[in-house]
Regions:
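ABC ATPase NBD Q-loop/coupling interface
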Residues: 10, 53, 64-79, 362-377
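Helix-to-loop junction immediately C-terminal to a conserved catalytic motif
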Residues: 50, 353
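Conserved ABC ATPase "signature" region
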Residues: 117-134, 411-429
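ABC ATPase C-loop
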Residues: 155-156, 450
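Catalytic Walker B motif of ABC-type/P-loop ATPase nucleotide-binding domains
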Residues: 163-166, 457-460
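H-loop/switch region of ABC-family ATPase nucleotide-binding domains
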Residues: 199-200, 492-493
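Conserved ABC ATPase "signature" C-loop
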Residues: 218-219, 511
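ABC ATPase nucleotide-binding domains
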Residues: 228-296, 529-562
Length: 562
């Protein structure tokens, strides 16, 4: 169905090809997962299937790419639209209408389908993706994850024979991601749809793949094989595979269920050991009752909170986005906000940075009211890395972005560039931000915000588009900031990140905080927000492979060579 024959792609101005001598054959009715580190050319390969590369992106494509027998060099994207449906990393770039229902119908209108067929397919897709309640909502009012589901639905309604998906679950909460992947699996198994998908969150998707295609590095040859075989040699792999490598399991498990079945011996080796938390929770501002108790006992009061929210409510049009929210974040504390798409996480961050005015209640950052504080003063108190990094990027080169960030923050020249070098090794000064991958743009935006070293750092889906190595670098930077006394609040659907990094997790649902406590207590008790290691080794409090590795090594129990 999809065939690459000796394909190389070189973009205008590039000295070397982004991908080189690619050979790939995807049979009809299979789901093939494309994996590899950030920046190796995965999005380029996906774009070549839909014809966007080179017709839209420019550059030179040598070799041959065919989809259902059509050569993408001689067929422009509009001539492939009846065969190929594409969802890129940025859902906003897909939308051409204003409301959810209209967007789902647009692709079918373009193909001239009958009105009764269009109506039936729209209803089916609304139900399949859990969008029925949003059918009349303006797309601009949806959360990032809801927009991503609409983008996926808009390519499902025309019933293409081939689906090309770039990070389709990156902005989805765990439950919504499972729903989308279940729909894709049904299309593959029942309708014979061919799916080529790139995804960094392998813990979500690798078990659904018929085959895995690995691009290990820029210009590297493509390896294609069974998921377990490729995961054994891949530089990127999910926690359950990492745990299997550590424990010496063969074959490597791809699912929590498989890992649990083989975990008996590992449980015995861990018996009597307790996971060491990678960092202790710092002193934070406590509740009024706790303060009175401490004063009566003569102990020192807590350090003042960097951010404090009390009785906060926010209305956005007819939607009550937040209600009765109480949250306090102290210096050096890392708090993860979790919850379904549309639960109010991004709204809470926007309120703390002054973009949204509360309907009632209070929000204070460093003692100041955010929406009443001027930008130059606010930037020294709080910084936000938004879901869409392009909101912060406007210059033509990475060097210009960094120079502007240094100037705005009053930092020494080179401060931002040094951060970029730590987070994004190998990115040249003259690189245009639009030429970076989604994850790389997000990391550049993070470096720009960190230049001012604000006491409070807010991050909205900070690992979207990041591979495991980039995520590890991000964790190191954020831990360093917390150790220096900076408070970090991140809204995330990445349960593995929350388990590894955060001191505390607050779960939001329908605009309210329904759980708020130490990370192990909150995530282990939640099937939706529990990391893979916790599920495998439950009811223990193990959250990460690093904790297991440390326990085994301290007892001299690790496998040789693990």
């Amino acid at each position: 169905m999809i065939r690459f024959e000796d394909v190389s792609v070189t973009y205008d101005g590039a000295a070397t090809p982004t991908v080189r001598n690619i050979e790939l054959d995807v049979p009809e009715g299979e789901l093939v997962l494309l994996v590899g580190p950030s920046g190796v050319g995965k999005s380029t390969l996906l774009g070549a299937v839909s014809g966007l590369v080179p017709h839209f992106t420019g550059g030179t494509l040598s070799g041959r790419v065919t989809v259902a027998g059509r050569d993408t060099r001689t067929h422009k994207p509009r001539e492939l639209a009846d065969v190929v449906g594409t969802v890129g990393q940025d859902p906003l770039s897909h939308f051409v209408t204003d409301t959810v229902e209209d967007e789902l119908a647009y692709g079918m209108e373009s193909l001239g389908l009958a009105p009764d067929v269009m109506r039936r397919r729209v209803e089916e897709t609304l139900d399949l993706l859990g969008l029925a309640e949003l059918r009349e909502r303006p797309i601009a009012t949806l959360s990032g994850g809801q927009q991503q589901r609409v983008a996926i639905g808009s390519v499902l309604t025309p019933h293409p024979r081939v689906l090309v998906l770039d990070e389709p679950t990156s902005a989805l909460d765990p439950a919504a991601a499972e729903e989308v992947l279940a729909v894709l699996q049904r299309l593959v198994h029942d309708l014979g749809t061919t799916v080529l998908m790139a995804e960094h969150r392998l813990e979500r998707v690798v078990q659904y793949a018929d085959q895995v295609a690995l691009l290990a590095g820029p210009g590297a040859p493509l390896l294609l094989g069974a998921p377990a075989e490729i995961m054994a040699v891949s530089p990127v792999f999910p926690p359950v595979v990492d745990l299997g490598r550590l424990a010496g399991w063969s074959p490597l498990p791809l699912t929590v269920r498989d890992a649990r079945r083989g975990s008996g011996e590992l449980r015995e080796r861990l018996a009597g050991h307790e996971p060491r938390q990678p960092h202790e929770q710092p002193q934070t501002a406590a509740s009024p009752a706790s303060r009175r108790s401490r004063l009566r006992s003569g102990r020192q009061p807590e350090v003042p909170a960097v951010a404090e929210v009390a009785g906060l409510a926010v209305r956005r049009g007819r939607v009550e986005a937040l209600r009765h929210v109480d949250l306090s974040v102290g210096p050096g504390e890392i708090v993860a906000l979790m919850g379904r798409n549309g639960a109010g996480k991004s709204t809470l961050l926007s309120t703390l940075v002054g973009l949204v005015r509360p309907s009632s209640g209070t929000a204070l950052v460093g003692g100041a009211v955010p929406h009443r504080t001027g930008p130059r003063e606010l930037i020294r108190r709080v910084g936000l890395v938004p879901q869409e990094p392009r909101d912060l990027l406007y210059a033509d080169t990475v060097a210009a972005e960094c120079a502007a960030a240094d100037h705005d923050a009053g930092a020494d020249p080179g401060t931002c560039r040094d951060l970029v070098s730590r987070l994004l090794p190998g990115i040249a000064d003259d690189t245009h931000p639009r030429d970076l991958s989604e994850g790389q743009r997000l990391t550049l935006a993070l470096a720009i915000v960190l230049t001012a070293r604000p006491p409070l750092l807010l991050l909205d889906e900070p690992t979207r588009g990041l591979d495991y190595a980039a995520k590890a670098r991000l964790v190191t930077v954020l831990r360093g900031l917390a150790a220096d006394g900076h408070a970090v609040v991140l809204a995330t659907h990445d349960v593995e990140l929350a388990a590894e990094l955060s001191h505390r997790v607050a779960v939001l649902a329908d605009g309210e905080i329904v759980a708020n406590g130490p990370t192990p207590e909150v995530v282990v008790a939640s099937p939706a927000f529990s990391p893979q290691v916790a599920k495998v080794l439950a009811p223990g409090k193990w959250l990460t492979v690093a904790q297991v590795r440390e326990a085994l090594e301290s007892a001299g129990l690790a496998e040789d060579g693990a």
